[in-house]
UniProtKB/Swiss-Prot annotation:
Native source organism of the sequence: Caenorhabditis elegans
Domain of life assignment: Eukaryota
Entry keywords, A to Z: Actin-binding, Cytoplasm, Cytoskeleton
Role summary: Functions as actin-binding component of the Arp2/3 complex which is involved in regulation of actin polymerization and together with an activating nucleation-promoting factor (NPF) mediates the formation of branched actin networks. Seems to contact the mother actin filament. Plays a role in time-dependent memory loss and the retention of conditioned behavior over time.
Gene name of the record: arx-4
SUBUNIT field: Component of the Arp2/3 complex, at least composed of arx-1, arx-2, arx-4 and arx-6.
N-terminal signal peptide: none
BP-aspect Gene Ontology terms: actin filament polymerization; Arp2/3 complex-mediated actin nucleation; epithelial cell migration; morphogenesis of embryonic epithelium
InterPro entries associated with the record: ARPC2, ARPC2/4
Protein family according to the UniProt entry: Belongs to the ARPC2 family.
Gene Ontology CC: Arp2/3 protein complex; cytoplasm
Subcellular location as annotated: Cytoplasm, Cytoskeleton
Protein name: Probable actin-related protein 2/3 complex subunit 2
Length: 301
């Protein structure tokens, strides 16, 4: 299985290039790049007001207002400090600004933090409910994040656990079958590792935890994946790794479904080619009459 990168590769490469050029004393070059990420996220790297000595990175998330209810702004200010603009670029939710004339000697941490902007936006809601669990607080309203147009994430804290539920829509009947097989591997994985979180999967109807939500989607192509996170997954030492892995689980699942379909199609095409070769070798040659230059006929064997 492939673990998706937590840091956006385009941001890493562009910022490393621009920062290296600035530290070497090179002439600043203009940049204006817009690109997409999973979950409908949109990024933009550009120069503010045409000033090539500065670079701004902006992100747009359709569900950012829901994350703001769980402290997203405060967490981002804590992580990015003075690099976070008080007013984001028009059409975006968050904007970071970097002065190429005032860079630290080592820009590695700067680049890594910037390329994890989407992850850090997501982190606020997880950290909030992890803290509820650590303090033994129950009864807080369940967090509902509509991270895609037809898919939702639910988070709820208990005194001994945090439950994270993803609803996802399978576009194809084949995806449902492959998804079920794939998720069964998570259950098997827990048998091999007792420290892994419990993973439950239901198809068609929401799990019992969401029975009180009439808006929870129902349908043959709707799946619900439930993670039960215990204190060993949510404590201060392990929470960052947990957030890294779980916030992108939906993308991870569908990415592997697509990879599995590609693999199956490739194998099927290879088998078809092999069968055609066998059939061609087994095909009998057709006997036919041929004539010589003088009009005599003869049969080919």
């Amino acid at each position: 299985m492939i673990i998706l990168e937590q840091n956006n590769r385009i941001i890493v490469e562009l910022l490393e290039q621009k920062f290296a050029n600035a530290k070497e004393g090179g002439k600043p070059e203009s940049v204006n790049v817009t690109f997409a990420d999973f979950d409908g996220v949109l990024y933009k790297l550009s120069n503010p007001d045409g000033d090539r000595t500065k670079i701004i990175l902006s992100i747009s998330l359709k569900f950012y207002t829901e994350l703001q209810q769980h402290g997203a702004d405060d967490l981002l200010r804590r992580v990015y400090g003075g690099h976070m603009r008080s007013t984001p670029e028009q059409g975006f939710n968050v904007t970071l600004e970097y002065n190429l004339a005032d860079l630290p000697a080592d820009t590695t941490d700067l680049v890594q933090a910037a390329s994890a902007l989407k992850r850090n936006c997501f982190a606020s809601v997880f950290e909030k409910y992890f803290e509820f669990q650590e303090a033994g607080q129950e009864g807080h309203k369940r967090a509902v994040i509509n991270y895609r147009d037809d898919e939702t994430m639910y988070i709820e804290a208990k005194a001994d656990r945090v439950t994270v539920i993803f609803s996802t829509v399978f576009k194809d009947a084949d995806d449902v079958i492959i998804g079920k097989v794939f998720l069964q591997e998570f259950r098997e994985g827990r048998k091999a590792s007792q420290t892994a979180p419990a993973v439950l999967y239901s198809l068609g109807e929401p799990p019992l935890e969401l029975k009180d939500l009439p808006e929870a989607r129902v349908g043959d192509n709707v799946g619900y994946i439930t993670f039960v996170l215990f204190p060993r997954h949510t404590n201060k030492k392990t929470k960052d790794n947990t957030i890294d892995l779980i916030h992108s689980f939906r993308d991870y699942l569908h990415y592997h479904i697509k990879c599995s379909k590609v693999y199956l199609h490739t194998r099927m095409r290879a088998k078809t080619t092999d069968f055609l070769k066998v059939l061609n070798r087994a095909r009998p040659e057709v006997k036919g009459e041929k004539k010589t230059f003088h009009g005599r006929t003869f049969q080919t064997q």
